[in-house]
Structure formats: structure tokens, C-alpha cells
Amino acid sequence: LTATISFLDKIRASSEKAILFAERKETQKMLQRVVKNRYGYTPKIINGDTPTSSDPNAGKQSRQSAIDDFQNRHGFGVIIMSPVAAGMGLNVTAANHVIHYSRHWNPAKENQATDRAYRIGQDKDVYVYYPMAVSPDFKSFDVTLDELLSRKINLASSTIFPTERIEVKPEDFEQIFNI
């Protein structure tokens, strides 16, 4: 939490905006209280409880209205999101800082969440932060999870490659199918 507050202090000093990703609703509420107490305003939270824009009962509480409020806010701002609920279909280009307060076990979901800031209309460099608890005496859970996610990413990138790079020749078919 100390590192996250330090990041937010620097972001505030630059009058920029941040997306703060956290998995658990309790953690999201705690982060909301921290931002309110430290910076004097209550950031919106987007998670599975936040109605989508297509929900006729959503009104001013929809995900898109929360993002619109955040996008239109002048100066420093924070929006708190679940990486799963906000992972697809939302554009948050007013933010150029992304903080993954808690990590998702699936690096693809984490990348999709980060991509909320990397959209058409983003005109600033985007910075991504992964605050971790570290210790000189033992390997923390955060470090272990970061290593696991790195291995998953490396495995995926070494086994999956774009199909346009595949060149199949007729002799390959002959060899494979003994034709």
C-alpha cells in the first residue's frame, strides 16, 4: 500500500490520472477510502456490481457513466476497477498510469485490463506499475506470483506465434501425410 500511495503522490504532482486495478471488492473499497482520505475525493469503483450501459436500470451508475465522469475530471484522478469486470470494451484514455494493486493469475486478463489505457485517443506515454512486497530473507507471495506470470507469458509467446509467419509448402503436406 505504501508503494501505491507513493505512485499516486507522484501522479498527483504531475496532474495526471491513474487506473487502480484490484481483484477483491473489499480491497477496492479500502483503496477508495485511502484515496478519499489522502486526496479529498471519492473515486468511482467499477466491478461486477456496476451495471453495464446496456442495463436499463443503470442510469447514472453505469460503467460508462463512471468512466465519463473520470475522463471529464480536470487534473489528478483515480478510478478503481476490477481487472475482470473492466477488462474488455472500456476505454479510459484520460489515464496514463495503470497500477495493478493486486495481480490476476491470468496474464492475458491482466494485459486486457492494462489495455484500457492503451486506446485510440491516448496521447501520453502509459506507465504500468506492479507494487510488490519484497523481503531480503524470503521470497514473498508477490515475487512468486510475478515469476509465475512471467513464466506463463514466456511459455505462451514461445508456443504461439502469428499464423502469417507459417509457410506451408506442398512437400510438407506430402511428408506429414505420406502422400
Task: List PLM regions with ranges.
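Conserved helicase ATPase core of P-loop NTP-dependent helicases/translocases
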Residues: I19-F21, K29-Q32, Y39-A86
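A short beta-strand element within the Helicase C-terminal
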Residues: L90-R103, V126-P131
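Conserved catalytic network of the ASCE P-loop NTPase/AAA+ motor domain
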Residues: K10-A13, D69-H74, L90-V92
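A conserved SF2-helicase RecA2
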Residues: W105-I179
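Short beta->alpha connector loops at strand-helix junctions that form conserved
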Residues: N47-D49, Y101-H104
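Hydrophobic, well-ordered secondary-structure elements that form the walls
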Residues: T4, L20, I80, V98, ...
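Alpha-helical elements of the RecA-like P-loop NTPase motor core of helicases
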Residues: T2, K29, R33, L90, ...
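Conserved helicase/translocase motor-coupling segment
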Residues: L1-V34
